[in-house]
A protein has these predicted regions:
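Structural beta-sheet core signal
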Residues: 67, 107-110
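Conserved SGNH/GDSL esterase-like catalytic core that processes O-acyl groups on lipids
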Residues: 2-91, 127
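Residue-level recognition of beta-strand->loop/alpha-helix junctions
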Residues: 32-34, 110, 149-151
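Histidine-centered active-site loop/cap adjacent to the catalytic His
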Residues: 146, 162-171
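Conserved beta-strand segments of alpha/beta enzyme cores
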Residues: 29-31, 105, 144-146
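Hydrophobic positions in alpha-helices of CheY-like receiver
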Residues: 93-97
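Substrate-gating cap/lid alpha-helix
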Residues: 113-150
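A short helix->loop->beta-strand "cap" motif at the edges of active sites that frequently abuts
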Residues: 100-106
Length: 171
């Protein structure tokens, strides 16, 4: 939902893939293949690999791929039961993009913050969030892929996440 642009006014213009397109200019074609509520976990409540956006992303055969998944995996329906599958599922996702375009450059993202005023924060979500961040770092190290830190720049700016989880257009 962060990639898709949930809660953003004029989403198609202001979601981060659209802003990235504006920054990069016409030399690049940036597409938004995010799906609101999607999980990285293939046994999660809404696996990204089962969404049409995933197949569209593979069919696009991107030269550059940015993956930001994991926030929805903090849901109690997902992490407690399937956490041990996270790294393998992530590597399978990466491999699918490599298979679609063997020359693709791929970046993984540390998740954007979840602030304490979010309703799920009081459950074990905070602990699971930190565990998932560690798993993402492990996957980046195991695959040799670069890691984009989306947490640190936003952590001190809760004003940029109106609902405590989804960045606004400025965020």
């Amino acid at each position: 939902s962060v990639t898709w642009g949930l809660t953003i006014t004029d989403r198609e213009k202001n979601c981060y893939p659209s802003q990235l397109q504006q920054m990069l200019g016409n030399q690049y074609e940036v597409k938004n293949f995010g799906h609101s509520g999607a999980t990285l976990l293939s046994h999660g409540h809404r696996p990204y690999i089962d969404q049409k956006e995933y197949q569209e992303a593979l069919d696009f055969k991107a030269d550059l791929v940015v993956i930001h998944l994991g926030l929805n995996d903090t849901d109690p329906r997902n992490w407690p039961e399937y956490s041990e599958e996270f790294n393998a599922d992530y590597i399978r996702l990466i491999d699918s993009f490599r298979q679609a375009n063997p020359k693709a450059k791929i970046w993984l993202c540390q998740m954007t913050p979840i602030f304490d005023r979010h309703p799920r924060f009081e459950s074990s979500t905070r602990d699971w969030y930190n565990q998932i961040q560690r798993h993402i770092r492990q996957v980046a190290k195991a695959t040799g892929l670069p890691l984009i830190d989306l947490n640190t720049p936003l952590y001190s700016r809760p004003d940029l996440l109106a609902d405590a989880i989804h960045p606004n257009a400025e965020g």
